[in-house]
Amino acid sequence: MSSNPRHDSMHEFRVEVVRLMLDGKAEVAFGLLSKHYGIREPALRVGTVKRHRKVLACYVEKERRIYLSNSSFLTNPFVLLHEFYHHLRASAVGKSRQVEKRADQFAEVFIRDFLSWRSAIVGRKR
């Protein structure tokens, strides 16, 4: 366990965000993320967008909306966090520079903290 309170609180925040997403509460998780980063919440919709019909999900900057191609992605933290990163970047920069690698890394940090938390919980139960 880290002795850095800031690290611990960020770790707990990330765990909570992923738990909410896994529980099907993506909008609540987006609310927490948006408040944390000081930006407006993105809208969320299941459906596809012209020219992006073959992707799992996409962020449409003009609408400030995340589209998921399938409702099963409503509980997929990696997809949700990846698309939220695009919303965060567009909100902060004001440009649609879609940086896939950084979006993946953003999502992976949350997932890694959640998996670390979950393995610690499972370890305590043994």
Show which residues each predicted segment covers.
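N-terminal low-structure segments adjacent to metalloprotease catalytic domains
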Residues: 1-17, 88, 108, 112
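Short pre-active-site segment immediately N-terminal to the catalytic Zn-binding motif
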Residues: 64-80, 93-98
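Active-site His/Glu-centered metal-binding helix of metallohydrolases
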Residues: 80-89, 102
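Post-HExxH zinc-binding segment in Zn-dependent metallohydrolases
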Residues: 96-126
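Aromatic side chains
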Residues: 59, 84-85, 106, 110
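Hydrophobic (often cysteine-bearing) scaffold residues that line and stabilize catalytic clefts
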Residues: 26, 77, 99, 103
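Metal-dependent phosphohydrolase cores
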Residues: 34-36, 79, 84, 115
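Auxiliary, metal-adjacent structural segments of Zn-dependent hydrolase domains
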Residues: 6-67, 71-73, 119-126
